[in-house]
Each structure stands twice: as C-alpha cells, then as structure tokens.
Amino acid sequence: MIFLDTSFLVNDEIQLCLKKTVDGNREKNWLPAYHFAICDKQGKEMGTCDLRIGHNLSTYYGGNIGYRIQEEYRGHHYAQKACLLLFELAKKHNMDHLIITCNPDNYASRKTCEYVGCHLVEIVELPEDNNMRLEDGETEKCIYQIELRGS
C-alpha cells in the first residue's frame, strides 16, 4: 500500500501531525496504519489517533479508527474533530465505510461516534481468542459504522 500525503489534515482548531506509518502484517492480521498526534494550531500535542486502512476481523472488533485525548484537553470535541479529518484520508484510500469501536461503558467515546454520524451496529462479546480480551481483559465492544460514500 502507498501511504498518502497527510498535510491536508487540518481544520480551524486542530491539525493531525503524522508520527509514523506502519505497514500491514498478514501473519498478525494487522492492516497498514497511520499514527498521528492531535495537535493545536501551535503544534502542542493534545492526544493521539490512528487510521487503519482496509477491513478484516481485527478491525471489526478493534475499529479502523482509534483515538485518545489527554485528560486536560477532554470536553472540547477534539476526538470528533480528528475523526472527521480521518474520514477524509480514508476516502482518499477509497474506503466506503469505517468501523469505530469502544467499550460499552465509555460514554464519551460513544457520544463521539454518534456526533460524527456513526450508527451503532451491535454490542458484541469479544471472542475468547481476541487480543483485547486476552491482553486487556476486555469482554465487550460497541461496534459503530459510518458510510463514507455520499458524505
């Protein structure tokens, strides 16, 4: 896969600053990914986000997009703003939909998914052999999806 220029991932409040790209790994079932710092206009890091390109069982449970906002910057919708920028990058990779997942008790993340236009597909129990279950003790995920075509 060819990684694209990401300098356009900016709006009036934030910019996504590319930290690294990671090639996919078929053996580990990993998809190619972009990893960003979510920064203010002066370049101060307020959180991180990533976009995984493509779809497989791992992204169904783990999502195409991940984000984390540092505690002191929460409440300003920075995750929402980052997701909207990542949608544009996903479109450039001809992705027609994206999955975002979160834990059922993560109400802030659930609101972020709803704010950006995702719909809840299901709340699912993670398979016994899923890494999030084995390594982090997580048992359930909310699976949200957004259609990118026509948006």
PLM regions and their residue ranges:
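Conserved catalytic-core motifs of GNAT/GCN5-like acyltransferases
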Residues: 101, 119-135
